[in-house]
Amino acid sequence: YGAGGPSFVHAMINLADGTRPTLKVVSDQFGNPTSALAVARELREILKRPELVGTYHMTCEGEASWHEFALEIFERMGISQKVLPCATEEFPRPAPRPANSRLEKMMLLLSGLPPMPDWKDALGEFLAKEFKNRK
């Protein structure tokens, strides 16, 4: 997710417009929520070191289901929105989604680069910048 959207973060905030008393969000698919800013910062560090070659998976630290991600978005935005967990089967998508999209970051660890930020911290930074004039 990044500035200007579209993204899951933007979609959740837009859906919490007061017209839906309850949202259902998938709770059985897990990943590493990662901001574009966190990836850009890590990429900048990699580019400073020409000896670092190969494929790098860059994700923020930690993991969450889409449901947990949505709850964190609303909590940090101070939005009172009821969010119920649901199974993937209850939320059909045009293309199947994996239950586990977490990425292994072994190349980053082996490179000696500092770890990327925790996903909750990166989300907080993003929300503070992207929605600074909202309230």
Where are these regions (language model features)?
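NAD(P)-dependent short-chain dehydrogenase/reductase
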Residues: 1-31, 37-38, 44
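C-terminal amphipathic/interface module of NAD(P)-dependent oxidoreductases
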Residues: 64, 99-135
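Residues at secondary-structure transition points
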Residues: 3, 7, 30, 34, ...
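Residue-level signal for alpha-helix termini/capping positions
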Residues: 16-17, 47-51, 131
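Non-catalytic, hydrophobic alpha-helical segments
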Residues: 39, 43, 58, 69, ...
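Short, surface-exposed alpha-helical segments at coil->helix boundaries
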Residues: 6-10, 67, 71, 102
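Mid/C-terminal beta-alpha module of Rossmann-like enzyme folds, strongest
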Residues: 42, 49-94, 99, 127
